[in-house]
């Protein structure tokens, strides 16, 4: 599963882990993404989205219909 949110576009970020002795090694911070199913009443079917927890709050605030319209306007297939 890809660690990219379909609503916000959040991706993993990269940086350095710094130990107590200040030795630096590469690491990545993954966003908290979940696979969630949402029901689209206009189409009468459910869709599965990979969304971050912030994306879930956006869906709760704006509604699934408007969020799906924005995703489709970007050219992403759902």
From Swiss-Prot:
A Pfam family annotated for this UniProt entry: Ribosomal_L28
Highest taxon of source: Bacteria
Xref: InterPro entries: Ribosomal_bL28 (IPR026569), Ribosomal_bL28/bL31-like_sf (IPR034704), Ribosomal_bL28_bact-type (IPR001383), Ribosomal_bL28_sf (IPR037147)
GO process annotations (BP): translation
Sorted UniProt keywords: Ribonucleoprotein, Ribosomal protein
GO function term, MF aspect, one: structural constituent of ribosome
Gene3D superfamilies: Ribosomal protein L28/L24
Any one annotated GO CC term: ribosome
UniProt keyword Methyltransferase present: no
NCBIfam families named in the record: L28 (TIGR00009)
Family under the similarity heading: Belongs to the bacterial ribosomal protein bL28 family.
Protein name: Large ribosomal subunit protein bL28
Native species: Corynebacterium aurimucosum (strain ATCC 700975 / DSM 44827 / CIP 107346 / CN-1)
